[in-house]
Each structure stands twice: as structure tokens, then as C-alpha cells.
């Protein structure tokens, strides 16, 4: 609600900028167009209308706002839905109001119109389409891929008012009737029927003479005159009927010559359109071949890079395995030497311990009170503790080596598993695959 009730009603109006979709921009296959092409639309002006006005009411009054010449005769309203423009159906025009085309319901206060184009590429507009073109478009129907123009095409509004044209058509028709009558064959069943009726009437009136032979010659002459007058009257009636039926033919402009010329123009237009379509199809085929070649080259490059990356990864893993096996072979001999040295160390340790214990036994009778405080006993304890520490260190080193080896093997197994999964998905999808680059380094 406005705070100032005395403000004029024009403050409640909304201004909308009207745009036309240019020819060739609309995607008839998808029946939509992207909003990125809005900058190329043609401006038809702006309108100031009530936001409560529906599209159906605006269609009737759009010529008043923009002018008859600026408004197409047949057009469709478009509405921005997402990133594309969609066609507004006839039922939706009575429901949608103009406020939905202005902020805050829309990004911009703009109204988009799509002119309807006929099958010959002509845009229906009030300034360019004449009555004759509309009738020719309405009377031309397409059946099984060919254009058919019916014979009962009505004349344009300018033709009935032209007397010279009527005279010419009447003269052509009479000439045609005379030419048809000069032919030996009968062209019209109705005319032959009328001629037959005339002959039968003459025969009838001629046969009436036989029962009245006693009549005078004057009476016979009078009867002959009456018969001749009756035949003339019937002939005039037949001519009047034909003459009264002829003006109805004026309503049909598709005389043989006009029909042939119109069909020739239609066939020529169809040939031109067909040639254009064939050329466009050839261009599209060439572009498609070119794009397919580029696609094949790109696929080959991707496959080559994929193979190179795959070979690098496999080479790194193979080199690591080779190093591991080589070091394992070397360490086998070193482990044998180490075990021998450990056995020798154990022997030396046992000998030293035996010597110290023997010396301790010899020194016992002298110093029975201070056995625990003797140097020999302390040396024995130190030796045992040192031996235990050495064993713990060796065990710690072996456990550490096993742990490092297990971690490296697990990392390598995870990378191999991911590679196998990627190869499997690639085979299922049937498309070239670009493997992911792992951040972890190859174990050494």
C-alpha cells in the first residue's frame, strides 16, 4: 500500500521493455533459447501497464501501446525460467500477470516476444503481410511432404472491384466454351442433356401434326411458328441459366492459367528451399566430419597420454619390486652372516659368564660376608643386563623393518587397487579414461 493516497494511479504502473527474438536465434529442436543471447534481441520499445494485467489482455492491447506496425500479427510470449526462455502456453496467458515479469519476481523488467514464422520463412506482421498473402498461406496445405493449393481459392478484396478484370475473365470463359463446343466430343453432360431435351421437344411437336391432317395450311404455319418460338424461348432460358451461373465462377480466381502459374511459383519456391536445405545438410555433414576427425585425434592423444602415464606408474612399481627383490637377495647372505655373528656373540657371552662365575666360586670362602658387594658379582650383573639390552635392540630393529615394509606394501596395494578399479570402470563405460594423479610418492 502506498503511504500517500493522493498519488496518481500512474505510480502503480510498471514499465516493461519489449524485445523480439531475431530470426534464426530460436532453437526449434529444443523449443527454447539461452538467456545469454538476450543481448542480441531486437527492441520494440517499452510499455507502461498495470502489474495486474494478464498476458491475454496485453495481447489484445499491445498494438495500442507500441503501434500496429511494431507488433507482429502472430507471436508467442516467453518467460525466463532458470537459464533459458520457455514458451507461455495459451492457457497460461490468462493466468500470468505482468508483475511476474518485473522485479522482484524477475531480474529485469523485460518482456520477450517470439514472432511466428510460416513454412516459407515469412514473418506474420501487420505491416508486411497483405490480405492476398494471408489467403494464399491459409489456403496452402502440405500433404505428404508436397504443397497442395485447392481450386476453390477466394479472390482478394481488390479483384472483384475491377471491371476490366471481370470482362477479361468473362471473355476468356466464353472463348473457352466456344472452343469446347467446336470439339467433336461432348464436354459437359448437362449441356448434352439440355440439347437432347430440345430435340425431343421438337420431335414431339413435329409428331403432333399427324392426328390433325384435316387442318388448314395456315394452322400448320401457325403451329410451326409457335414451335419455333417455344424452342427459342427454351434456348433463351438455357442461356439465361448459363449466364446466371457464370458470375458465380468469378468468385473462383483459380482459372487454369492462374492455377498453373501459382503451382509453378510454388514448385519453384519448393525447389529453391529444397536446394537450400540440401546445401545446408552438406555443410552440416562436412562440419560433422571435421569435428569427428578432431574428436578422433583428441581421443588418440588422450589414449597415448593415458598409456604413457600407465607405463610410468607400472615402470615405477616394477622398478621398486626389482629393487626389493635384489635387496632381498643381498640381505639373505647378510642375514646369514648376522646370525653367525650373533651365535658367536652368544658363545662369547656364555664363556665370559662361566669365567666370572668360576672366579666368584673361588673367591667365596675368603669373602663370604660381602658376596653381593664384590666386583665380580657386579660385573656379572652388568653383563647380563647389557646382553638383555642388546637383544631388545635387535628385536626392535627387526620389528621396525617389518612395519616399514608392511606400510610400503600396503600403499602399493592400495594404488594397484585404484588402478584396477579405474580400468574396470573404463571398460564398463567404453570411454577413454584419464587416470588420477596420486599425491603419494612411489615407495623406494
Curated annotation (Swiss-Prot):
Keyword presence, Nucleotide-binding: no
Transmembrane segments: none
Coiled coil: 268-403
Key word Coiled coil present: yes
Compartments in which it is found: Cytoplasmic vesicle, Secretory vesicle, Acrosome
UniProt keyword annotations, A-Z: Coiled coil, Cytoplasmic vesicle
Domain of life: Eukaryota
Alphabetized InterPro entries for the sequence: SPAT1, SPATA1_C
Pfam family of the protein (one): SPATA1_C
Expression by tissue: Highly abundant in the testis, and is also expressed in the heart and kidney (at protein level).
Any one annotated GO CC term: cytoplasmic vesicle
Assembly description: Interacts with IFT20.
Protein name (Swiss-Prot/TrEMBL): Spermatogenesis-associated protein 1
Organism: Mus musculus (Mouse)
Amino acid at each position: 500500500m502506498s503511504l500517500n493516497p493522493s498519488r496518481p494511479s500512474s505510480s502503480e504502473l510498471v514499465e516493461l521493455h519489449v524485445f523480439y527474438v531475431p530470426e534464426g536465434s530460436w532453437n526449434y529442436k529444443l523449443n527454447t533459447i539461452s538467456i545469454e543471447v538476450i543481448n542480441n534481441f531486437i527492441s520494440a520499445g517499452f510499455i507502461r501497464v498495470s502489474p495486474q494485467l494478464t498476458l491475454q489482455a496485453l495481447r489484445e492491447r499491445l498494438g495500442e501501446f507500441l503501434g500496429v506496425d511494431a507488433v507482429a500479427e502472430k507471436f508467442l510470449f516467453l518467460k525466463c525460467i532458470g537459464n533459458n526462455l520457455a514458451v507461455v502456453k495459451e492457457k497460461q496467458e490468462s493466468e500470468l500477470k505482468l508483475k511476474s515479469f518485473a522485479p522482484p519476481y524477475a531480474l529485469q523488467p523485460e518482456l520477450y516476444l517470439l514472432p511466428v514464422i510460416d513454412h516459407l520463412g515469412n514473418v506474420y506482421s501487420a505491416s508486411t503481410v497483405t490480405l492476398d498473402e494471408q489467403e494464399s498461406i491459409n489456403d496452402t496445405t502440405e500433404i505428404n511432404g508436397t504443397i497442395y493449393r485447392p481450386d476453390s481459392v477466394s479472390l482478394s478484396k481488390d479483384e472483384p472491384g475491377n471491371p476490366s478484370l471481370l470482362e477479361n475473365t468473362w471473355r476468356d470463359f466464353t472463348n473457352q466454351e466456344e472452343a469446347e463446343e467446336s470439339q467433336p466430343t461432348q464436354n459437359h453432360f448437362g449441356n448434352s442433356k439440355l440439347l437432347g431435351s430440345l430435340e425431343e421437344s421438337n420431335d414431339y411437336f413435329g409428331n403432333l401434326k399427324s392426328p390433325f391432317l384435316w387442318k388448314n395450311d395456315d394452322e400448320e404455319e401457325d403451329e410451326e411458328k409457335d414451335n419455333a418460338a417455344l424452342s427459342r424461348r427454351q434456348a433463351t432460358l438455357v442461356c439465361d441459366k448459363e449466364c446466371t451461373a457464370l458470375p458465380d465462377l468469378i468468385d473462383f480466381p483459380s482459372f487454369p492459367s492462374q492455377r498453373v502459374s501459382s503451382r509453378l511459383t510454388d514448385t519453384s519456391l519448393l525447389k529453391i528451399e529444397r536446394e537450400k536445405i540440401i546445401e545446408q545438410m552438406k555443410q552440416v555433414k562436412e562440419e560433422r566430419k571435421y569435428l569427428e576427425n578432431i574428436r578422433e585425434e583428441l581421443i588418440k592423444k588422450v589414449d597415448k597420454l593415458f598409456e604413457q602415464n600407465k607405463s610410468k606408474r607400472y615402470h615405477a612399481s616394477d622398478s621398486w619390486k626389482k629393487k626389493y627383490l635384489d635387496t632381498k637377495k643381498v640381505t639373505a647372505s647378510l642375514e646369514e652372516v648376522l646370525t653367525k655373528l650373533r651365535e658367536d656373540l652368544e658363545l662369547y657371552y656364555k664363556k665370559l659368564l662361566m669365567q666370572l662365575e668360576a672366579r666368584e666360586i673361588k673367591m667365596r670362602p675368603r669373602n663370604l660376608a660381602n658376596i653381593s658387594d664384590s666386583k665380580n658379582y657386579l660385573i656379572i650383573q652388568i653383563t647380563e643386563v647389557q646382553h638383555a639390552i642388546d637383544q631388545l635392540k635387535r628385536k626392535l630393529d627387526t620389528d621396525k623393518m617389518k612395519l616399514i615394509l608392511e606400510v610400503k606394501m600396503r600403499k602399493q596395494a592400495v594404488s594397484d587397487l585404484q588402478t584396477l578399479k579405474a580400468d574396470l570402470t573404463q571398460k564398463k563405460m567404453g570411454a577413454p579414461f584419464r587416470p588420477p594423479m596420486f599425491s603419494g610418492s612411489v615407495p623406494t
